[in-house]
């Protein structure tokens, strides 16, 4: 399958810009996900060839190790995406979010670029270079900063922009936003909505985030610190609103390989609190993906059933909700020149 065919599988609203004349474009940056079962291999290959993910300095060794990881995971990953309808939900949900953003804020154009699957930043920026765009906002869709996510996406986007010699717009960035009280109110409302008529004090609330090898944190990545700070801010907000859970905990999911990863694991906390009702919020994601809809919603739900946990609830991500869209617009409007 060639690049043009790949692009057909990944919706993007760049064409809509032809009927608009905003001078600023906001590009939502995320990791991407397979838009078909064919793209599972593309997704894994690109991810494990990323030096921010697989931090092996020797390019040859990184590619060799990456190829081994891809070969060991591709069939398992395809089965996961088969259960999700043959593709990741991340791209279509992001497309829906940009459509909503363009409706709510016609003064700017909102689009998106993915790190490991189409539409890549290079493709999006090539298109924008043909239009009279004067300024860009690179918007990281990760609430907390990490070299493995935020920095990787920014590095990719800036390298793609640098390669376009005649396109030199002003560029501003939003690299983290977890400390926003407005965001945390939206998160808390999502948790309460998921609880429905259940009492919060009857539940252990687990904020599950994507795990990282401890070596990356030891090298100076601030991700763990920011996740812990984020949970503290949410605890403060819950106290202010007199909302109480049995416990509020932070955990790390999606461990890969034999190396030491951040702890406690989400699986470990579910087992530890098997005698309690559990509600999980995916704190490091803004758009649902395989780690939320498969790992949390399917895999760990089966685990909870085996452990005879009475109530196991999983909150959705913010996705294309109007509240999240308005929050993004507010962040962009308040962004100071750098």
Curated annotation (Swiss-Prot):
PROSITE patterns: FERROCHELATASE. Pathway: Porphyrin-containing compound metabolism; protoheme biosynthesis; protoheme from protoporphyrin-IX: step 1/1. Its EC number is 4.98.1.1. Fe cation binds at residues 210, 291. Keywords: Cytoplasm, Heme biosynthesis, Iron, Lyase, Metal-binding, Porphyrin biosynthesis. InterPro entries: Ferrochelatase, Ferrochelatase_AS, Ferrochelatase_C, Ferrochelatase_N. It holds the Pfam family Ferrochelatase. One of its GO terms (molecular function) is ferrochelatase activity. Belongs to the ferrochelatase family. This is Ferrochelatase. The lineage of its organism: Bacteria, Pseudomonadati, Campylobacterota, Epsilonproteobacteria, Campylobacterales. The gene is hemH.
């Amino acid at each position: 399958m060639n690049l043009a065919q790949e692009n057909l599988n990944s919706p993007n609203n760049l064409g809509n810009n032809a009927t608009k004349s905003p001078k600023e474009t906001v590009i939502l940056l995320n990791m991407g996900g397979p838009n078909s079962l064919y793209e599972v291999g593309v997704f894994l290959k690109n991810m494990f060839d990323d030096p921010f993910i697989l931090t092996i300095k020797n390019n040859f060794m990184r590619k060799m190790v990456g190829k081994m990881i891809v070969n060991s995971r591709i069939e398992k990953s395809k089965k996961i995406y088969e259960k999700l309808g043959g593709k990741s939900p991340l791209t279509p949900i992001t497309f829906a979010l940009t459509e909503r953003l363009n409706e709510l804020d016609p003064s700017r154009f909102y689009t998106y670029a993915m790190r490991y699957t189409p539409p890549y930043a290079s493709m999006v920026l090539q298109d924008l270079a043909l239009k009279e765009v004067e300024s860009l906002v690179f918007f990281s869709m990760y609430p907390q900063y990490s070299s493995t996510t935020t920095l990787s996406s920014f590095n990719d986007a800036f390298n793609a922009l640098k390669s376009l010699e005649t396109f030199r717009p002003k560029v501003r960035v939003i690299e983290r936003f977890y400390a926003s009280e407005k965001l945390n109110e939206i998160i808390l409302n999502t948790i309460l909505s998921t609880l429905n008529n259940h009492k919060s004090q009857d539940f252990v609330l687990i904020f599950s985030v994507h795990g990282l090898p401890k070596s990356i944190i030891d090298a100076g990545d601030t991700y763990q610190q920011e996740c812990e700070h984020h949970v503290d801010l949410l605890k403060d907000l819950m106290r202010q609103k007199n909302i109480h859970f049995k416990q509020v905990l932070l955990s790390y999911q999606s461990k890969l390989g034999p190396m030491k990863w951040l702890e406690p694991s989400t699986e470990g906390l579910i087992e530890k609190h098997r005698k309690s009702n559990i509600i999980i919020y995916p704190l490091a994601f803004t758009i649902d993906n395989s780690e939320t809809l498969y790992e949390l919603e399917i895999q760990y739900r089966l685990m909870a059933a085996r452990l005879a946990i009475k109530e196991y609830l999983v909150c959705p991500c913010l996705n294309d909700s109007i509240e999240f869209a308005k929050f993004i617009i507010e962040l962009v409007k308040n962004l100071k020149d750098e």
